[in-house]
């Protein structure tokens, strides 16, 4: 469908599209992946996709309907001589896939950067018990450096590793955002 895109671009678009279905119950992930692979390359009728994949058309329709609910596929109703009923031809809207993914990644980056600037720039205290919350210096002082939940002494938490992990995640998100923006530019 998008001849100017390379295999790597198509893989990114497939992964981004499939990420929109991550939380969907009742959708077979393998059918979803293979269905997206088909409509990434061409417009297709659900029955043709099902036949090509060797699966029940209802499974393919489930995937297509969920993607349609998210606004990333469109369809058009048509009549074909070989079918006795109207059929629906499905097409992936790559620009919308990219727009939604960019929006989500930017939001994630904003959250990570907020955590880096706020949470990670101030000392945090914890008792060591997984069930108990972390506290800021001010909160720890209010409780006289004792955990209000279990009564243990609060110790300063070393945030070095968490900070490093958040910085790595922020860099990964920036790289992914740049890649998606370049892809969007090429699609026009």
From Swiss-Prot:
Lineage: superkingdom: Archaea
Record's protein name: Transcription factor E
SUPFAM superfamilies on file: Winged helix' DNA-binding domain
Sequence intervals crossing the membrane: none
Species name: Methanopyrus kandleri (strain AV19 / DSM 6324 / JCM 9639 / NBRC 100938)
Free-text comment about domains: The winged helix domain is involved in binding to DNA in the preinitiation complex.
Residue ranges constituting the HTH TFE/IIEalpha-type domain according to the UniProt record: 9-98
Pfam families (UniProt xref): TFIIE_alpha
Keywords for this protein: DNA-binding, Transcription, Transcription regulation
Function, as annotated: Transcription factor that plays a role in the activation of archaeal genes transcribed by RNA polymerase. Facilitates transcription initiation by enhancing TATA-box recognition by TATA-box-binding protein (Tbp), and transcription factor B (Tfb) and RNA polymerase recruitment. Not absolutely required for transcription in vitro, but particularly important in cases where Tbp or Tfb function is not optimal. It dynamically alters the nucleic acid-binding properties of RNA polymerases by stabilizing the initiation complex and destabilizing elongation complexes.
Example GO BP: transcription initiation at RNA polymerase II promoter
Quaternary structure (record): Monomer. Interaction with RNA polymerase subunits RpoF and RpoE is necessary for Tfe stimulatory transcription activity. Able to interact with Tbp and RNA polymerase in the absence of DNA promoter. Interacts both with the preinitiation and elongation complexes.
A GO molecular function held by the record: DNA binding
Family: Belongs to the TFE family.
């Amino acid at each position: 469908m998008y001849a100017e895109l390379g295999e790597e671009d198509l893989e990114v678009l497939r992964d981004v599209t499939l990420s929109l279905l991550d939380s969907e119950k009742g959708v077979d992930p393998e059918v979803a992946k293979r269905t997206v692979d088909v409509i990434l390359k061409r417009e297709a009728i659900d029955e043709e996709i099902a036949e090509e994949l060797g699966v029940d058309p209802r499974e393919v329709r489930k995937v297509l309907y969920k993607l349609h609910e998210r606004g990333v596929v469109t369809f058009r109703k048509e009549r074909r001589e070989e079918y006795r009923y109207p059929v629906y031809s499905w097409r992936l809207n790559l620009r919308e896939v990219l727009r939604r993914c960019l929006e989500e990644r930017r939001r994630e980056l904003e959250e990570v950067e907020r955590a880096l600037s706020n949470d990670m720039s101030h000392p945090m205290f914890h008792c060591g018990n997984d069930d108990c919350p972390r506290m800021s210096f001010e909160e720890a002082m209010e409780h006289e450096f004792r955990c209000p939940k279990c009564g243990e002494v609060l110790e300063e938490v070393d945030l070095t590793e968490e900070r490093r992990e958040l910085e790595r995640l922020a860099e990964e998100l920036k790289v992914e955002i740049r890649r998606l923006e370049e892809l969007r530019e090429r699609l026009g």
